[in-house]
């Protein structure tokens, strides 16, 4: 990580020639995010509208919606806050340069122009994530390799050494996006996907991704004025995301390393202020407000393990029981992600299963609301209830639908 802090106005040394350094004026060599305070949020298409609302509440402005993403403007403190708090975004990117890119030589040449020693040392590791669409460069892996070569050669020419690539746990993640022969190179502000919260210590087959669960909780409108119950909680992802949302716990509270720490203008004091303010804003979870159950002993154990890693997780009760055996859940929000073909491994008895679920909701959940996520929407028709609404939620590799039922 660079030890220079742009906010002080002190010139940094940049390795501009092999084995030789010299100072340069910062204003002339600023990157896009520095000049324009402009950033890019990657988000699933069906979650984009609510992600935009979330961005605004976290301090973003001047939103511009594009395919699978949102451009936004933010002060540095809000950029840190968004990366730390967002529950819906996949990644937040700080763009460095954009350029016309019609072939591999353009990629290599422009990537070599970036002062990579400002973002990492030759002893640190990096990885490239690349996305290519409607371009003369047709393979994202090939495009990423050209950027990798440019970075490696940049350091080799100046230090006689090449930094290593680490796809699993890199110090720096560089994002390459090419669309219609126009490329942008960015730094991943979180050094990895934001759905990785850090509380998942145990899992079950085909677990729900955290950003999907967070989107469901947000779409439910749940504000803690009624109890929340998940009768098929699996490893507890919906319960955990409901807890974090209610308690106002930052989504990345367990992440200790962020990509924005590698940026040349990183401000440690400002980042500390964001964390302190977030900690003061946390509120406790009343016992009994969030609870769940599952027929599987393994799932219940996994859910308890994951919840105990969270603040106030001990206030969430999880029991082992078949939802068909639950006497009743009145005046509550019932939210769940039932088993489907992918999770069950076969379609046997699933029609009857969903009929039983509908009867349970209708007969034992008086004066409640139910939000049911169907990873395979073909099963919606087998629930003997009339939905209030159905909304697509294609995120985390699932082409699913969230269905709301009002129960009287």
Model-found features: residue ranges?
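A short, acidic, amphipathic alpha-helical segment used as a generic capping/interface helix at domain edges
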Residues: 118, 322-326, 353-361
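Conserved Class I SAM-dependent methyltransferase catalytic core
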Residues: 32, 38, 42, 46, ...
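Conserved S-adenosyl-L-methionine
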Residues: 208-328, 342-343, 347-349
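Non-catalytic nucleic-acid substrate-recognition regions in nucleic-acid-modifying enzymes
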Residues: 4, 15-170
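S-adenosyl-L-methionine
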Residues: 19-26, 33-47, 51-57, 64, ...
């Amino acid at each position: 990580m660079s030890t220079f802090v742009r906010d002080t106005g002190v010139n940094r040394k940049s390795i501009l020639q092999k084995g030789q350094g010299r100072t340069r004026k910062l204003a002339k060599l600023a990157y896009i995010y520095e000049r324009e305070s402009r950033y890019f949020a990657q988000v699933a298409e069906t979650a984009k509208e609510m992600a935009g609302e979330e961005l605004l509440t976290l301090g973003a402005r001047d939103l511009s919606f594009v395919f699978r993403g949102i451009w936004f403007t933010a002060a540095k403190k809000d950029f840190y806050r968004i990366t730390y708090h967002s529950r819906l975004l996949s990644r937040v990117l700080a763009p460095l340069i954009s350029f016309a890119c019609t072939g591999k030589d353009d990629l290599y040449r422009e990537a070599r122009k970036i002062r990579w020693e400002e973002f990492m040392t030759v002893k640190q590791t990096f990885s490239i994530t690349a996305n290519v669409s409607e371009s003369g460069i047709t393979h994202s892996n090939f495009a990423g390799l050209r950027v990798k070569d440019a970075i490696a050669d940049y350091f080799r020419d100046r230090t006689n050494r090449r930094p290593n690539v680490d796809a699993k746990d890199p110090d720096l993640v560089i994002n390459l996006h090419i669309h219609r022969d126009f490329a942008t190179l960015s730094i991943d502000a979180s050094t990895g996907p934001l759905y990785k919260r850090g509380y998942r210590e145990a899992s079950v087959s085909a677990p729900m991704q955290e950003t999907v669960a967070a989107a469901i909780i947000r779409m439910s409108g749940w504000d803690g004025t009624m109890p929340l119950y998940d009768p098929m909680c699996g490893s507890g992802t919906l319960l955990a995301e409901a807890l974090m949302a209610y308690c106002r716990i930052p989504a990345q509270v367990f992440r200790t390393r962020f990509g924005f720490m590698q940026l040349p203008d990183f401000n440690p004091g400002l980042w500390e202020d964001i964390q302190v303010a977030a900690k003061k804003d946390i509120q406790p979870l009343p016992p009994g407000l969030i609870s769940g159950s599952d027929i599987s002993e393994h799932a219940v154990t996994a859910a308890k393990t994951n919840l105990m890693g969270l603040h106030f997780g001990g206030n969430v009760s999880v029991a082992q029981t078949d939802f068909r055996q639950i006497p009743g859940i009145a005046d509550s929000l019932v939210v769940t992600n039932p088993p489907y073909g992918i999770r069950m491994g076969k379609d046997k008895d699933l029609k009857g299963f969903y009929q039983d679920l509908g009867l349970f909701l209708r007969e034992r959940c008086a004066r409640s609301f139910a939000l049911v996520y169907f990873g395979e929407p073909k099963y919606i028709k087998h629930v003997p209830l009339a939905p209030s609404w159905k909304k697509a939620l294609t995120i985390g590799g699932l082409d699913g639908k969230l269905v709301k039922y009002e129960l009287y």
